[in-house]
Amino acid sequence: MFAPENGKLLGAQIVGFNGVDKRIEMLAQVIQRGGTVHDLAELEHAYAPPYSSAKDPVNMAGFVAENILNKKSRIIQWRELAELPADTIRIDVRTHDEYKLGTIPRFINIPVDELREHLDELPKEKPIVVTCAVGLRGYLAYRILVQNGFKHVRNLSGGYKTWSVATAPIKEIVSHKPEIPESTSYGLSLIH
């Protein structure tokens, strides 16, 4: 979470397994120093090429936030979908198989790998919203459209996964219990 007027980092949340603690620590240090998303993009960290990349997910989060601040990427939040004008073109750029498993109402399926083949079918003057699973392919589709003269394009922040969790009935979210391992690889019990 960052302040849109200056990019100051206000908070962070990470969901995952391996390396989450390391990355939250990196983010906490930037927040403690009153840092910005620009600091995230420039953050240096130790890494070994066989085990991680030169650009950490924390750096990538900084790049995404910088693109939003610098207007290189326009996003829309899931709450705003209901307020879109009726003539908005809504495109789900996931694969056909992913789309069949579920989609956001009124979104048509044009996989990102096929988008260039359909550019002449899309009206350049109408607003367009793109989505994918979590945002990366949506960003790629956004760039394809903008670079081909489409002016009113936005990418759904967090993609289909964020929308599906945000709009799911609370009972459905609460009833989903993750599996908790009973022991670690060291034979230590995790359940007391």
Q: Where do the protein language model's features map onto the residues?
A:
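C-terminal catalytic lobe of FAD-dependent flavoproteins
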Residues: 1-40
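Generic low-polarity alpha-helical segments
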Residues: 1, 191-192
